């Protein structure tokens, strides 16, 4: 339920976001009702048509609570489309309890994985009194709803890996990040600034593509 009050002469933009991941094929209708004691009520009809089509594979939510690091090995019964690409898994919880999955190849250390996950979480934390960041719930919820995956790959050779291409061609959305680009604070490479650290950049691409662009059009327009 969306409600609010506009004073006379005020202007507000309302962005409607629809999650269709669990909706079947068909026609759907909703309405936006604008009520006022001083004018005629306005009803704006919203129509949504979902066409049939092949759904992309979806990575199930795995329980990571048994792992001290929050990182687990992928179960052997994982869909081969994912299991042929990565061997470990973790996730970040969105505001509405959905999850944002992270798939991991074997060259990543636990410290590197934790660093990437912490960076993602930091982007989704509210910033009090910030112009755009005071409420990021819709952004984290949008990422979870798209089923997008943060894919941690060993190195550039993985761009020639046919299993990685099969995953992308299946319709799975995501953002890659290489182990050769991740240097946690305190590591030798970080302290010496001897290598390019792309963690913040690539994770921000992930948040932007699957969160900000979907859930916050006003912020996107400013960008």
For every predicted segment, state its role.
Residues 42-43, 57-61, 76, 206, ...:
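Generic low-complexity segments that are intrinsically disordered, proline-rich and/or Lys/Arg-biased
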Residues 35, 84-91, 134-140:
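Intrinsically disordered, low-complexity boundary segments flanking structured domains
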Residues 97-223:
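Acidic/His-rich structured neighborhood in mature extracellular/periplasmic domains
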Residues 54-96:
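N-terminal low-complexity, Pro/Thr/Ser-rich intrinsically disordered segments
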């Amino acid at each position: 339920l969306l409600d609010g009050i506009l004073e006379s002469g005020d202007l507000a933009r309302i962005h409607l976001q629809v999650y269709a991941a669990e909706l079947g094929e068909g026609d759907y209708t909703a309405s936006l009702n604008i009520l006022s004691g001083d004018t005629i009520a306005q009803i704006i009809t919203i129509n949504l048509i979902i066409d049939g089509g092949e759904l992309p594979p979806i990575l199930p939510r795995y329980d990571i609570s048994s792992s001290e690091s929050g990182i687990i090995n992928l179960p052997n019964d994982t869909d081969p489309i994912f299991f042929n690409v990565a061997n470990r898994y973790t996730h970040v919880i969105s505001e509405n309890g959905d999850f944002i999955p992270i798939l991991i190849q074997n060259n990543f250390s636990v410290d590197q994985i934790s660093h990437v996950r912490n960076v993602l979480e930091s982007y989704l934390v509210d910033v009090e009194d910030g112009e755009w960041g005071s409420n990021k719930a819709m952004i984290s919820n949008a990422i979870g709803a798209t089923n997008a995956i943060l894919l941690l790959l060993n190195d550039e050779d993985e761009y020639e890996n046919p299993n990685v291409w099969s995953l992308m061609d299946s319709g799975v959305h995501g953002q890659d990040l290489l182990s050769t680009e991740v240097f946690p604070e305190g590591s030798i490479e970080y302290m010496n600034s001897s290598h390019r650290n792309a963690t913040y950049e690539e994770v921000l691409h992930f948040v932007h593509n699957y969160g900000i662009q979907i859930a916050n059009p006003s912020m996107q327009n400013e960008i």
